[in-house]
Design a protein with these regions (language model features):
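Amphipathic alpha-helical protein-interaction segments
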Residues: 59-61, 75-100, 161
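Compact, glycine/acidic-enriched structural inserts
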Residues: 85-125
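Acidic, proline/glycine-rich low-complexity IDRs
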Residues: 132-226, 231
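Amphipathic, interaction-prone secondary-structure segments
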Residues: 40-79, 166-167, 171-184, 222
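Short N-terminal edge-element motif at the start of the domain
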Residues: 9-54
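Compositionally biased, non-globular sequence tracts
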Residues: 3-4, 8, 12-20, 108, ...
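Generic amphipathic alpha-helical segments used as scaffolds and interaction surfaces in large
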Residues: 23, 27-30, 128-140
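Tandem repeat scaffolds
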Residues: 188-285
Length: 285
C-alpha cells in the first residue's frame, strides 16, 4: 500500500533521527537536569499558591496533545498519597523546544517526504509515526536523568517541593508506561519485610528494582541472579550477604556499613559506594 511504501521510504530518516536524538540527549544532559530543577521550583511555587501541603507522586510527561501542536514542553504533575483520587493535584509546564529540535526537524522531513502520495498518506499517519518516537525518546531521557539526579540531595534539586517520606518521580506519557527516575522511601521497615520481598522477587523478577531500604540490618543471605538495579541501602548494615551474579547497576549504599559481603560476578556499573564503610567485603570476580 501507499502507506507501507511511505513508511519504508522514511525509515532511514527515522533511524537517523534516533541516532541524532540519542546524541543530543547525552550532549544536553545538564540541560535536561536543569529542566527538572526549574520544574521543581515552579511546582513549589504552585503548591504554595494552592495551599498544597505535600506531594508523593511526581510525573513528567511529554504530552501528545502538545506535540500535535508543536508545543514542545514537559508537564510536571504532582499528587499526594491519594494518587488518582487527589482532588487538588498541582501541575506546571517547562518549555523544552530547543532540546527537542531533532524531533521538530524529523516532523518537517516526514511532511516533505509525503509529496507524491496524495491523500493516501495524511497528517494523522505522520503523527502516528512521530508518536512512536516519543516512547523511544522518553527512554533516552530517562537513561540520562537517572544518573544526573542521583545526587539530587546534594544539589538541592527537590528542595522547593515538600515531599512525603515515601515519594517517587517518574517520566513518561501515561502513568502505566512511565519509568522511575528517583524513588525514596525513608521509612524504617520491619526486618521481615526484607525477607518477604526477596521471596516475592523469585516470582516477580523486578520486585527489587528501585527498592529502598532505610536504617535497617540485612544479614545472612545468599542472593543469586537477581535483578536489583537501582536498589538503595541508606544508613543501613548489610552483613554476611553474598550477592552472586546479581544486576546491581546504579545501586546506592549511602552511609551504609558492609561487613562480610561479596559481589562475585555482579554488574556494578554505576554503583555508588561513597560514604560507605567496608569490613571483609570482596568485589573479586
Amino acid at each position: 500500500t501507499a502507506l507501507q511504501n511511505y513508511r519504508e521510504a522514511v525509515s532511514r530518516k527515522i533511524a537517523a533521527f534516533r541516532s541524532h536524538m540519542g546524541d543530543s540527549v547525552l550532549e544536553h544532559a545538564e540541560d535536561w537536569e536543569a529542566v527538572v530543577e526549574k520544574a521543581m521550583k515552579l511546582l513549589g511555587e504552585q503548591m504554595e499558591k494552592q495551599g498544597k501541603e505535600y506531594v508523593c507522586f511526581l510525573y513528567f510527561s511529554l504530552l501528545k496533545s502538545d506535540t500535535i501542536n508543536r508545543n514542545y514542553r514537559v508537564q510536571l504533575h504532582g499528587l499526594d498519597m491519594s494518587w488518582y483520587m487527589d482532588k487538588e493535584p498541582v501541575e506546571v509546564y517547562v518549555d523544552v523546544k530547543e532540546l527537542l529540535t531533532p524531533l521538530d526537524e524529523l516532523w518537517n522531513e516526514l511532511v516533505c517526504a509525503n509529496q507524491g502520495y496524495g491523500v493516501s498518506v495524511n497528517e494523522y499517519d505522520i503523527q502516528n509515526l512521530l508518536f512512536d518516537e516519543l516512547t523511544i525518546m522518553d527512554n533516552m531521557i530517562c537513561q540520562v536523568l537517572r544518573y544526573r539526579l542521583r545526587d539530587w540531595e546534594k544539589k538541592g534539586i527537590f528542595e522547593p517541593v515538600t515531599r512525603s517520606p515515601y515519594w517517587v518521580l517518574r517520566w513518561g506519557e501515561y502513568r502505566d508506561q512511565t519509568e522511575i527516575l528517583v524513588q525514596t522511601d525513608r521509612v524504617e521497615k520491619d526486618p521481615g519485610v526484607w525477607k518477604t520481598e526477596l521471596s516475592k522477587a523469585a516470582r516477580e523478577p523486578e520486585k527489587m528494582v528501585f527498592s529502598y531500604w532505610y536504617k535497617g540490618t540485612y544479614a545472612d543471605r545468599t542472593i543469586r541472579d537477581m535483578d536489583m538495579r537501582f536498589i538503595t541501602f541508606e544508613e543501613s548494615t548489610v552483613q554476611n550477604i553474598v550477592f552472586q551474579n546479581c544486576n546491581l547497576e546504579g545501586s546506592r549504599f549511602p552511609g551504609t556499613r558492609l561487613t562480610g559481603c561479596s559481589f562475585e560476578g555482579c554488574n556494578l556499573w554505576g554503583a555508588d559506594f561513597r560514604e560507605c564503610t567496608f569490613e571483609q567485603t570482596s568485589f573479586a570476580g
